Amino acid sequence: MDISDFGTVLPIGIEKFANDFDNVDILAGFDNDELIISNFEKIEIEPNNISKVKDADIFTLLINGKVKDNLLINEVTNNENNYVISREQENIAFGDLKENKNLILYGDLSNGKTITAKIIAYKLLREGYEVFLLNDFYLKDSVFNEVDEILKKFEKTIFIIENYTANMDVVAHINISRNLNTKMLLTSRTFEHEKYIDDILFNKKQLDVNETFEEAVDKISENDIEKFINYLDRYGLWSEKSSFNLMQKKNYIKNKANSEIHGILLGILESPAVKSKIDLLFKEMVGSETILRNILAILCLNISNINKVTHHLVSAMTNDSSIFSSSFREKSIFYQLVNENTDGLFPKSSILSEYILENFLNPEVLVNNLIVLCKNIHSKSFSRNDMYMQIYKDLASFRYAQRILPKRNKRESLINFYEGLREIDQERKNPHFWLQYAIARLSFSDKDNLSSENLIYVRHHLETALSLARSIPNYWTDDIDTQYARYYVELAKTYSLSDVDLAFNDFIKAYELIIKIHKGGRYKKEIVRPITFFDKFYQKFSEVFEEDQKIKLELCCKNILKIITNYPTDVRVIKANKILSEIIKDINFKNHIINNV
């Protein structure tokens, strides 16, 4: 290429060039009012957008989680349900954001929070709001200035912050700088939201609790179930369940899919045609330990909410450099499971990632390899708060561990997982590790009663956690006390009816711990978790309680009910409220029968 390729070259000389350069207006061509942003994406609706939904679009949306914005805009504009389903939560959330300053949408993987957020954004665009989405990767040095410029330029503004708990510095700045008509639409996975929301609203008060509305999107409402049935009918996605009648399909969504989009998607993956392809992937994965660990690293990092999975990060987890080889990444299993671009490595489907992990053919092989990956990433950490330690903490937490381990023999796999992590020297001195280990042993008690032997281990782990915690200045032990309360409820359930006094004493210990935690003054909804197991204890011993025990039990339930009545509503609070109310009602009913015989 030569300079003449760009046009005619005129010899003007150096002096002429210098004079012309001095006279150039560097502001020419720029609109001083133009907003230049790099940390946010301005969401806009293209005019005359007409696109028809194809079957391939539906499959790509459901299995790969890839949203076509033009089709989504059509849905909002035309009020249709061809591409996505207009859900009850969406309408409730939209109304609440119009009335309040902040809306938080939270839900687990593949349950529709991103689509719901986009639909709400498009609706508000049509009502005159300017909508800005925070990019996954932004410059902290300039993002605050961009927020200020946006707020100066536009009166009605909505900021969408995905994974908001990891971006609280930006959220806090918007909250402090906001105008009268500034709104925030925040999204998060359920685990992160529940972990931090109490601190954000009640302890640090980074958002106004009276102006912040929380909407869980995990569950499909009763009114929307039939919409989902019609949607699956229209696109022939029922597979071998196509012959089900309406009631059978409703029961499938409610029970098998747990009234969740996530459950419906897993059901689609279980169809014979898709399942046979996945079985081939399993065989290729277990055929090579190197392939298995690299694939597992990418899948686990995706599920643990890492936005940018780089080759270096995968290499750090596997302690292997194979991922840098293009020939290694060109293997068929990578092509089928992983997308690669300049930002890093991404599973083609989050729901497929979870399905592969949940249904792994050999749980022991998976657990052993996950332990190796966790040990590797832990060994790379040089600070309590560096990226490697944050990844390790995520993967080693009970909430994530139960999602990345096979559903077959889940509790046994969890226990084996924490037994493996116990070999890390630092973890044996960490109270939080022993707490997670205890939670693993307490897990899934609703499916079967925990054995007395298992509960002995639970007590040992909790005693270790509490002892280590007390040696650390200002260590907050409420989480340990919460699991102690849960332990006492589970222990009470193991006694025979003839040992009702021992069972009742353990119940009182659980009650006293719950009251102690509440009096500590740090608001946390986790306090209600042990309460959700009271019903099984009551059902077992209700016919053998002494009169004074019934009186005390009723008083305990009333005291706790009074406490949690002031808690913001969520699924666990509602469940605890219902259980306590039913116990009180049953005690009063039985007393009424006795007194009127």
Which residue ranges define each predicted feature?
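Acidic metal-coordinating catalytic centers involved in nucleic-acid phosphodiester chemistry
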Residues: 1-72, 230, 558, 565, ...
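Walker A/P-loop nucleotide-binding motif
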Residues: 99-117
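Post-Walker A helix-loop "phosphate-sensing" segment adjacent to the P-loop in P-loop NTPases
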Residues: 122-132
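Conserved P-loop NTPase "ATPase switch" module shared by AAA+ and STAND
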Residues: 133-142, 146-178, 183, 187-190
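Alpha-helical repeat scaffolds
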Residues: 370-374, 409-424, 451-470, 498-518, ...
